[in-house]
């Protein structure tokens, strides 16, 4: 059964494995989530489930969302995300999804919004080398050559240049689940995941480990 859950990034810490080695982990508060809606191939053209996470007061929702939750008989949730799962038909509306669907040793893909860095140059944004710092150099951290002169007499689209960095949807693949704490709804995965503290994350089965 394919699995997926929503969670919040708590922060990073470290644990020790059986050999006594330090393992850096990210602590995620995963679930409990509720299936708010089911989408089927016959009705919607594809199979998926809509999952809600974190309770919220009904007064903080607009009318369309209030009606959406009332229609399916589910308590209002702050976050709604759609998960395309191969066996979405096995889930039922109102079903609770908890963190214990995962177990230590499994591999997961974690999706989040990366930290926004603002407007950055090519050295920080793209990892380019700086120019010479002495001997009459005319530039140090500039882009350098941006293309030919007479022909084509323009800069091609896609050229790596300064601009806004971060704040984009990023997925980190094939992270190992180190520990699962069902009592506190905590999931510990090896390594780092995108996003600030308390940012929303989507945790799914890894596509590479299948």
UniProtKB/Swiss-Prot annotation:
Q: Does the keyword Heme apply?
A: no
Q: Name one GO molecular function term.
A: rRNA binding
Q: Which UniProt keywords apply?
A: Ribonucleoprotein, Ribosomal protein, RNA-binding, rRNA-binding
Q: Does this UniProt record's set of keywords contain Cytoplasm?
A: no
Q: Which Gene3D superfamilies match?
A: 3.30.160.810, Translation factors (2.40.30.10)
> Any one cellular component term from GO for this entry?
cytosolic large ribosomal subunit
What InterPro entries is this protein classified in?
A: Ribosomal_uL3, Ribosomal_uL3_bac/org-type, Transl_B-barrel_sf
Q: Which PANTHER family match?
A: 50S RIBOSOMAL PROTEIN L3, LARGE RIBOSOMAL SUBUNIT PROTEIN UL3C
What is this protein for, i.e. what is its function? One of the primary rRNA binding proteins, it binds directly near the 3'-end of the 23S rRNA, where it nucleates assembly of the 50S subunit.
- Family listed: Belongs to the universal ribosomal protein uL3 family.
| Xref: HAMAP family | Ribosomal_uL3_B
Q: How does it assemble?
A: Part of the 50S ribosomal subunit. Forms a cluster with proteins L14 and L19.
Q: What is this protein called?
A: Large ribosomal subunit protein uL3
Species whose genome carries this gene:
Caldicellulosiruptor saccharolyticus (strain ATCC 43494 / DSM 8903 / Tp8T 6331)
């Amino acid at each position: 059964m394919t699995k997926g859950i929503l969670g919040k990034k708590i922060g990073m810490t470290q644990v020790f494995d059986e050999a006594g080695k330090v393992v850096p982990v990210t602590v995620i508060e995963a679930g409990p989530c509720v299936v708010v809606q089911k989408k089927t191939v016959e009705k919607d053209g594809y199979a998926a489930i809509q999952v809600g996470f974190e309770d919220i007061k009904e007064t903080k929702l607009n009318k369309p969302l209030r009606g959406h939750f009332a229609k399916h008989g589910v308590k209002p949730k702050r976050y709604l995300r759609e998960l395309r799962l191969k066996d979405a038909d096995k889930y039922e509306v109102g079903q609770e999804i908890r963190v214990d669907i995962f177990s230590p040793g499994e591999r997961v893909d974690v999706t989040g919004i990366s930290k926004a860095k603002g407007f950055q140059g090519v050295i920080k944004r793209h990892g380019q080398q700086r120019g010479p710092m002495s001997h009459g150099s005319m530039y140090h951290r500039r882009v350098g050559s941006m293309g030919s002169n007479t022909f084509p007499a323009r800069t091609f689209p896609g050229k790596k240049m300064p601009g806004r960095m971060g704040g984009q949807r990023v997925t980190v693949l094939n992270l190992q689940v180190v520990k699962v704490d069902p009592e506190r709804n905590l999931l510990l995965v090896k390594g780092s995941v995108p996003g600030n503290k308390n940012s929303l994350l989507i945790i799914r089965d890894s596509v590479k480990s299948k």
